[in-house]
C-alpha cells in the first residue's frame, strides 16, 4: 500500500502517534522518554528501586508494577545530544501511528510502526497545524463530506551524519501524513 485513508480516534497527537526514545537492558527498558502534558518537554524516566520490607531481606510486592521516576543523573530531562546512551546508539527512537481505516470494521485501532525521525517530526507539524485550524480537533473526518487524512509513503533523500562526522544523503521511504 502506498496510500490509504485514515481517521484518528482522539484529538491529542501524543495519543495517536505515541513515540519514545528508549534504552533496553537484557530484560526490560532501562531508560525511556515521556512527554510533558503539553507535548513540549521530553523527560528521561527509569524504574524506581524496588522497596524492601522492614527486615531488609524481602522485596515488597508492588501493585500495578514498578513505578517510573525521572532519571537522577541527568535531572530528568531527555537531551539526546548530551546522553551517553544515545551517543553510543543504545537509545533509539520508536513510534507508531494509531488509526482507523474508514470502511473497515474494527474494535481496536490499526498500528503502523516507524523509527523515522523525519516521519514523526513532519506528522507532529501536520497534527499541530490541523488542530489549530480545526479548533483543536484531530479525531474523525476532516469535514462534513467525510474527508479523511491519508497515510502515504514517499521515497525521499534524507540527510544523516556518518561515522566520520560528514553529512550524507541517502534515499529512504518515509511515512507521510496528508
Segment roles from a protein language model:
Residues 84-178:
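Extended serine/threonine-enriched, polar tracts that run as long, contiguous segments within proteins
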Amino acid at each position: 500500500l502506498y496510500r490509504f485513508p485514515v481517521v484518528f480516534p482522539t484529538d491529542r497527537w501524543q495519543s495517536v502517534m505515541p513515540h519514545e526514545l528508549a534504552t533496553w537492558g537484557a530484560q526490560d527498558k532501562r531508560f525511556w522518554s515521556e512527554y510533558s502534558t503539553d507535548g513540549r518537554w521530553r523527560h528521561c524516566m527509569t524504574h524506581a528501586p524496588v522497596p524492601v520490607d522492614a527486615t531488609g531481606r524481602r522485596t515488597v510486592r508492588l501493585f500495578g508494577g514498578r513505578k517510573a521516576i525521572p532519571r537522577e543523573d541527568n535531572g530528568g530531562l531527555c537531551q539526546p545530544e548530551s546522553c551517553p546512551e544515545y551517543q553510543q546508539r543504545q537509545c533509539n527512537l520508536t513510534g507508531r501511528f494509531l488509526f482507523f481505516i474508514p470502511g473497515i470494521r474494527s474494535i481496536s485501532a490499526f498500528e503502523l510502526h516507524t523509527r523515522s525521525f523525519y516521519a514523526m517530526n513532519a506528522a507532529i507539524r501536520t497534527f499541530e497545524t490541523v488542530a489549530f485550524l480545526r479548533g483543536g480537533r484531530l479525531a474523525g473526518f476532516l469535514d462534513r463530506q467525510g474527508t479523511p487524512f491519508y497515510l502515504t509513503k514517499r521515497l525521499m533523500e534524507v540527510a544523516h551524519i556518518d561515522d566520520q562526522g560528514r553529512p550524507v544523503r541517502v534515499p529512504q521511504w518515509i511515512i507521510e501524513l496528508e
